[in-house]
């Protein structure tokens, strides 16, 4: 695990402990199980792909540890609506909302605001290290959760996937290398995210996805993450058979994120 990732995960351990003092595991689970039906995250991606379009998970992200504040004019509901509308022809399939406070200046309310403003399924983008966070995610309205292989040992990762599935939530498992991919493929989820950013060096290379794609079975839906900034990046990946993408920074820097999405994936 990289130094920054370890630092983040250590903070998460403290955050979860504090959260459980405010709301017990039992109460959080009860709240999660009482929520209305989830939106079909995987189905939304596949529907776009079946139409010949890219399945885009559009990210709502105010800041990052490496770039600082990315978007000053940050209104999650407006951004979500913009993504859902696109240019009228090309639009997002799903949303991803950062809820981490300390490192990404996110918060759970951003997810709630985004989901309430449009019909798209929503991924909670955070660093999951404890089953409590799965129930917490559903309680705040998430339809999908992110499990980062580098943060989790196999048994805990499988357990957290099962908790998510019991709540009818989708799981996006994220990897960066072959060893992590091998571990991720033991899970049942069809969603496999390949992060082109090396979390140790923060260097980004699309070659990561191109190399690992060969090892992803046809029944899994590969999602390319990070480093997708220009149409040439999209064309490179789509020519290699990649049809689903998670993109944030390229859109967050644009005045109209939805139109920026439509232009990138035109």
Curated annotation (Swiss-Prot):
Enzyme class label: lyase
Annotated InterPro entries: Aldolase_TIM, Indole-3-glycerol_P_synth, Indole-3-glycerol_P_synth_dom, Indole-3-GlycerolPSynthase_CS, RibuloseP-bd_barrel
Single GO MF descriptor: indole-3-glycerol-phosphate synthase activity
Pfam families noted in UniProt: IGPS
Keyword 4Fe-4S: no
Keywords recorded for this protein, A-Z: Amino-acid biosynthesis, Aromatic amino acid biosynthesis, Decarboxylase, Lyase, Tryptophan biosynthesis
Gene Ontology process terms (BP): L-tryptophan biosynthetic process
Recorded metabolic or biological pathway in which this protein acts: Amino-acid biosynthesis; L-tryptophan biosynthesis; L-tryptophan from chorismate: step 4/5
Enzyme Commission number(s) of this protein: 4.1.1.48
Top-rank taxon: Bacteria
Reaction catalyzed: 1-(2-carboxyphenylamino)-1-deoxy-D-ribulose 5-phosphate + H(+) = (1S,2R)-1-C-(indol-3-yl)glycerol 3-phosphate + CO2 + H2O
Family: Belongs to the TrpC family.
Entries under PANTHER family matching the protein: INDOLE-3-GLYCEROL-PHOSPHATE SYNTHASE (PTHR22854:SF2), TRYPTOPHAN BIOSYNTHESIS PROTEIN (PTHR22854)
Protein name, as recorded: Indole-3-glycerol phosphate synthase
Record organism: Acidovorax ebreus (strain TPSY)
């Amino acid at each position: 695990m990289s130094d920054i990732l370890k630092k983040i995960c250590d903070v998460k351990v403290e955050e979860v402990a504090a959260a459980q003092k405010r709301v017990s595991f039992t109460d959080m689970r009860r709240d999660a199980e009482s929520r209305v039906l989830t939106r079909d995250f995987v189905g939304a991606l596949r529907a776009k792909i079946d139409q010949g379009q890219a399945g885009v998970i559009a990210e709502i992200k105010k800041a990052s540890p490496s770039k600082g504040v990315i978007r000053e004019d940050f209104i999650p509901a407006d951004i979500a609506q913009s993504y859902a509308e696109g240019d009228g022809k090309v639009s997002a399939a799903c949303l991803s909302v950062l809820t981490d406070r300390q490192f990404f200046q996110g918060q759970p309310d951003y997810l709630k605001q985004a989901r309430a403003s449009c019909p798209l399924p929503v991924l909670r983008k955070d660093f999951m290290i404890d089953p409590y966070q799965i129930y917490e995610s559903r309680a705040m309205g998430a339809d999908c959760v992110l499990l980062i292989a580098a943060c989790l040992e196999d048994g805990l990762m499988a357990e957290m996937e099962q908790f998510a599935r019991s709540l009818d939530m989708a799981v996006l498992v994220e990897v960066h290398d072959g060893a992590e991919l091998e571990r991720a493929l033991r899970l049942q989820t069809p969603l496999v995210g390949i992060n082109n950013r090396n979390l140790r060096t923060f260097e980004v290379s699309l070659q990561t996805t191109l190399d690992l794609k060969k090892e992803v079975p046809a029944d899994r839906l590969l999602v390319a993450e990070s480093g997708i900034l220009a149409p040439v990046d999209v064309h490179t990946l789509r020519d290699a058979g990649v049809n689903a993408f998670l993109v944030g920074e390229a859109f967050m820097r644009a005045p109209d994120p939805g139109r920026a999405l439509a232009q990138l994936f035109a």
